[in-house]
């Protein structure tokens, strides 16, 4: 089965497990990050798992990520301005998605994976607290917080299957993915918590639309270096990396023209 088919099966499973009529009348449907899903499936293929296990583990990791993202919405400024019932339902939705992944792993009786994911969840939440409370002392610490928020879960998956040589690539790939998302958010809404925090540390106070561009260039350089350390990378993931490089070039032209 090709990677695209595995991705579609996992996304179908996610839709089935997050389907809740009442919640969907009040909240947007959960969003699957296609780049994280591709990276997750790529790791599981590298671990030589069969298709059934790939689908189970990829669905589990994606549900965990959705649960964490959903709970994070409660701290979002726009959510704070919403109704109390929306905030309560958002917490409830996050709990519902969390319960689904516990159920999945319980069915395959993988207690060891539960422990690994619990550590990953703890790391994500600790780094989110430090990020939103702006506890970082410098730009390097901010970038490390974002890397850990984005990559801790998938790195734990890699560690579980003894694929730690992927860690540096995972960090840079998902950091670049997040920077791209933040850039798009900023372009369309003129809002980005990450842009604001990074800009606070800029001594020369760049134009805000230039801040993420600066760090994307640095991340691209690191990603190009670390991809060489992956023994074998599938064509779909390689194409996605190339696409991120191309997106960066296009966005750089947009920034320069703007």
Place the predicted regions along the sequence by residue:
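All-alpha prenyltransferase/terpene-synthase fold signal
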Residues: 1-258
């Amino acid at each position: 089965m090709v990677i695209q088919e595995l991705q579609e099966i996992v996304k179908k499973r996610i839709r089935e497990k997050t389907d809740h009529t009442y919640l969907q009348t009040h909240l947007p449907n959960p969003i699957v990050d296609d780049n994280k899903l591709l990276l997750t499936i790529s790791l599981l293929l590298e671990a030589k798992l069969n298709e059934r296990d790939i689908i189970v583990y990829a669905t589990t990791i994606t549900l965990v990520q959705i649960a964490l993202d959903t709970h994070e919405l409660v701290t979002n400024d726009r959510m704070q301005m919403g109704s109390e019932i929306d905030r309560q339902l958002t917490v409830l939705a996050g709990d519902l998605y969390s319960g689904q992944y516990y159920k999945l792993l319980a069915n395959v009786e993988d207690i060891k994976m539960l422990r690994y994911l619990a550590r990953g969840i703890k790391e994500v939440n600790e780094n989110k607290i430090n990020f939103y409370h702006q506890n970082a002392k410098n730009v390097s610490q901010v970038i490390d917080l974002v890397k850990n928020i984005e990559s801790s879960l998938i790195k734990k998956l890699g560690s579980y299957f003894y694929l730690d040589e992927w860690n540096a690539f995972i960090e840079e790939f998902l950091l670049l993915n997040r920077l791209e998302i933040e850039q798009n958010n900023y372009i369309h809404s003129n809002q980005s918590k990450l842009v604001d925090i990074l800009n606070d540390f800029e001594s020369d106070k760049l134009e805000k639309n230039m801040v993420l561009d600066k760090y994307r260039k640095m991340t691209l350089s690191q990603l190009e270096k670390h991809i060489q350390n992956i023994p074998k990378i599938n064509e779909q993931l390689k194409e996605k990396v190339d696409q991120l490089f191309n997106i960066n070039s296009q966005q750089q032209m947009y920034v320069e023209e703007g």
